[in-house]
Amino acid sequence: MAHYSYLDSNSVVVTVTVGKDETELINGLDTETYYAQGTPYTVKRTSYNTYGGVHSGGGVPFRKNYASIGYTYDTERDAFIAPKPYPSWVLDEATCLWGAPVARPSEGLWLWDEATLSWIKR
């Protein structure tokens, strides 16, 4: 079993479905091509075991992150990237995850405050 994301014309994920294993051909077509047939979407396989470029089961990470609705597929990075949570946050190229411009304190619960560009203790 594998998971497939459907991308609109802006490469934004509109849905994610379960399908046949990616190593199988269906009617002579690779699975991404097969599932895209008859739709206005581009289909890209995604792995629910991959987050931040790491495979949770120790396997090979795939496309940096599991695709979710609203994520963007970046063809240059071959990665799924979440929407940017705050204007000041920066994309980590290695993980394709967004990070605050200031490191979060390690102890306690903190919320990001975009107005002050700092962490506020909860």
Residue ranges of predicted features:
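Interaction-interface detector
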Residues: 1-122
